[in-house]
Amino acid sequence: MKKVIVLSLGGSLIIPNDVDSKFLKKFRQTILRNTKNHKFIIVCGGGSIARKYISGLKAVGANEYLQSMIGIACTRTNARFVSYFFNKDQEYGIPNTLETLDKYLKKQDVVFCGALEYKPNQTSDSTTAQIAAHFKAPFINLTKVSGLYTKNPKDYKDAKFISEIS
């Protein structure tokens, strides 16, 4: 049985301003080189496009549910894009439940997803943690952020860096 590894691929790595093809090519090579012994679930974040859409909805007073839903849509769009970048077309689409992930993982070595079902205050990183716990798999967080913060440092100037956790 292949070991499952769950990766959170930050949207800022996929599309910092433009698509980062150089990074994505190296990422693809690394993942595909390791499918002999591992299966991967790659959870894609929404990145700056999600933040821009959410900001636009905030500006017109849209509620948090609608803001979350546009963020979820961005994560799923990024997941679809990255799957195509890997030259993979997940024939049943982007999974949106743990049960669907289970089914996909039985058939594929690499599964791409974004956020799953709507939950208040959910992020792609918390989704990745939930998926990793479900599969009893390691969680690797790939991001442009320099470390762990109390809040998103891009959105909150009072975010504090956490240098150590136990």
Language model regions located:
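N-terminal glycine-/serine-/threonine-rich phosphate-binding loop
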Residues: M1-I41
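Acidic, metal-associated active-site segment
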Residues: S126-F135
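Active-site phosphate/oxyanion-binding loops
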Residues: K58, E91-Y104, D109-V110, K119-N121, ...
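A charged helix-plus-loop insertion that forms the helical arch/lid used to bind
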Residues: I54-T75
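A short glycine/serine-rich beta->alpha loop
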Residues: E64-I70, A115-Q122
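Short beta-strand segments
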Residues: V6-G10, C44, F112-A115, L142-T143
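Short, active-site-adjacent cap segments at secondary-structure transitions
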Residues: L13-I15, G47-R51, G147-T150
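Ordered, amphipathic secondary-structure segments that act as subunit-interaction surfaces
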Residues: A73-L98
